[in-house]
Amino acid sequence: MARGKAKEEGSWKKFIWNSEKKEFLGRTGGSWFKILLFYVIFYGCLAGIFIGTIQVMLLTISEFKPTYQDRVAPPGLTQVPQIQKTEIAFRPSDPKSYEEYVVNIVRFLEKYKDSAQKDDMVFEDCGDVPSEPKERGEFNNERGQRKVCRFKLNWLGNCSGIDDETYGYKDGKPCIIIKLNRVLGFKPKPPKNDSLEFSPGTKYNPNVLPVQCTGKRDEDKEKVGSMEYFGMGDYAGFPLQYYPYYGKLLQPKYLQPLLAVQFTNLTMDTEIRIECKAYGENIGYSEKDRFQGRFDVKIEVKS
């Protein structure tokens, strides 16, 4: 037994290092050098092929514009305040109940203040009335960064925060700010005048992408009451001169146009579902994405 164990232990040690043949784990130094050299060259070639493929692919991709722009989905429509579950519930007599919503709006509108748009090297005036899309050249760096249209906060009227720092919440007349999400190169195509029935008090302009808010269900439509829209030129929509968007590299300070809606006569103590939709020839809607071209929000004003 002892001899067998000694012999077995000796063969195991001999496999690790054979002093007679100068072998380590069954290979000589020259053999180990050759096999290591082979794998270094083999994996080096694989890495070279991989890096070369990536470099060729990067040559076909522009950092300023997506290659497959036609496959990008239409932009989403979202609201501020941005809250979880898109539910707004508050009591006008209790400032704490709507503080979160007001702070959310204040923070969002910070970059729309006049003091944040003073740099004439970055911002430019694009008029006070809606006009056609403003082309700023090709999507490349030949002309450097492109200027951005200013957006005046006072266009948002009662929802600007200039005269009412609570944006109507203390009076039970809440405001929401609506924006169209940024899609690089997207140019909205408004619908024809006769293809859309406009709400009372709203008007058509071929250079405005219209937005309308209504009750989501039949019972909601009766409880929404009246509402007011505030935007450039008092149009309920987004003026086209703010498009197309050239991306963060070419327009890092871009300000998307805004539309404010104030609900002035909501039925109290009732949860009301409100749907807002943008209308356009290239605006789409999806059952899988409830923010594509539209959104709905629940609002409850408590007594």
UniProtKB/Swiss-Prot annotation:
Gene Ontology MF annotations: ATPase activator activity; ATPase binding; nitric-oxide synthase binding
Cytoplasmic side: 1-34
UniProt subcellular location: Cell membrane; Apical cell membrane; Cell membrane, Sarcolemma
Cited NCBIfam families: Na_K_ATPase_bet
Membrane-crossing segments per the record: 35-62
Lineage of origin: Eukaryota, Metazoa, Chordata, Craniata, Vertebrata
Protein name: Sodium/potassium-transporting ATPase subunit beta-1
Topology in the lipid bilayer: Single-pass type II membrane protein
InterPro entries: Na/K_ATPase_sub_beta, Na/K_ATPase_sub_beta_sf
